[in-house]
């Protein structure tokens, strides 16, 4: 699921070992309510027509931000066009409609029925026929049998899951032996999520969570994925003004190549392979 508010970290982020007890039912209801409200704001003919195509309309910085995530995920997955792809946490289709340009078979799921309904309407409006949108819980993909997909991708979703580990185990269950995972994590070492957002008065999402790269690797490995690798990307926020976007793109190109700098990027992308063992 993709949303605007993020966690404001005045204290170090909770690690797997430090997690406080969570009422998972309450947390999921809160998330569903949030997205139901967001979907209601967009559920109109003007939004369906906006952008002149299936892609969800957003500002240039947001489109660049999403493009970079998807481009990186495609490179890390290294999957052919005929691969069966599952996207978990698709929201209204922000990344989904980019994936449909690459893959012949995309299934996209989200916890929010309202988000899925909106994504379906957008796909129908723009005649995107190679995607199936379904309501599903990332931590319990009960509608899918084992080994259903060649690739599982998830963007801006694990950060909101009560148990990212449980979700990643489900991702592995529905991936075929040899299947690939690519998921993203907001980087706890990025200044944007703490002092910068505080200075801008941006309200945190109550259930958001940040991850250091080592923690993301450990969680993915702990869920049974092998050959786990991470990559730091993006210093550009979706909120960057149009006039500054060119400068921030340059910052990304340079910063992502410098080891001492890239560790402070906004996003940690993680990939893994399902070795088929149970």
Model-based region annotation:
Residues 182, 195-200, 218, 228-278:
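A C-terminal cap/extension of S-adenosyl-L-methionine-dependent methyltransferases
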Residues 92-140:
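Class I SAM-dependent methyltransferase SAM/SAH-binding core
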Residues 165-177:
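A short glycine-rich, Lys/Arg-flanked "PGG" loop and its adjoining helix->strand segment in the class I
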Residues 179-185:
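Conserved beta-strand signature within the Rossmann-like core of class I S-adenosyl-L-methionine
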Residues 187-207:
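Short, glycine-/aromatic-enriched active-site segment of Class I SAM-dependent methyltransferases
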Residues 5-8, 13-79, 252:
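Conserved class I S-adenosyl-L-methionine
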Residues 139-151:
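A short acidic, Gly/Pro-enriched loop at the edge of an enzyme's catalytic core
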Residues 208-223:
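Short alpha-helix
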């Amino acid at each position: 699921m993709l949303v605007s508010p993020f966690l404001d970290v005045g204290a170090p982020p909770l690690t797997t070992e430090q997690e406080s007890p969570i009422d998972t039912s309450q947390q999921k209801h809160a998330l569903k309510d949030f997205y139901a409200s967001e979907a209601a704001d967009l559920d109109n003919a003007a939004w369906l027509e906006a952008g002149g195509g299936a892609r969800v309309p957003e500002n240039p910085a947001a489109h660049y931000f999403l493009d970079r995530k998807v481009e990186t995920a495609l490179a890390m997955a290294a999957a052919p066009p005929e691969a069966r792809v599952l996207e978990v946490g698709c929201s209204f289709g922000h990344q989904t409609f980019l994936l449909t340009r690459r893959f012949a078979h995309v299934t996209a799921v989200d916890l929010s029925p309202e988000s899925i309904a909106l994504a379906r309407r957008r796909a129908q409006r723009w005649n995107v026929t190679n995607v199936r949108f379904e309501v599903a819980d990332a931590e319990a993909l009960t509608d899918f049998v084992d080994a259903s997909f060649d690739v599982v991708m998830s963007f801006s979703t694990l950060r909101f899951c009560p148990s990212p580990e449980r979700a990643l185990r489900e991702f592995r269950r529905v991936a075929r032996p040899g299947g690939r995972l690519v998921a993203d994590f907001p980087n706890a070492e990025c200044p944007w999520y703490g002092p910068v957002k505080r200075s801008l008065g941006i309200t945190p999402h109550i259930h958001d969570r940040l991850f250091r790269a080592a923690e993301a690797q450990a969680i993915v490995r702990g869920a049974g994925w092998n050959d786990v690798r991470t990559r730091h990307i993006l210093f550009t926020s979706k909120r960057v003004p149009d006039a500054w976007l060119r400068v921030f793109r340059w910052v990304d190109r340079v910063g992502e190549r410098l080891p001492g700098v890239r560790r402070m990027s906004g996003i940690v992308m993680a990939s893994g392979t399902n070795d088929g063992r149970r």
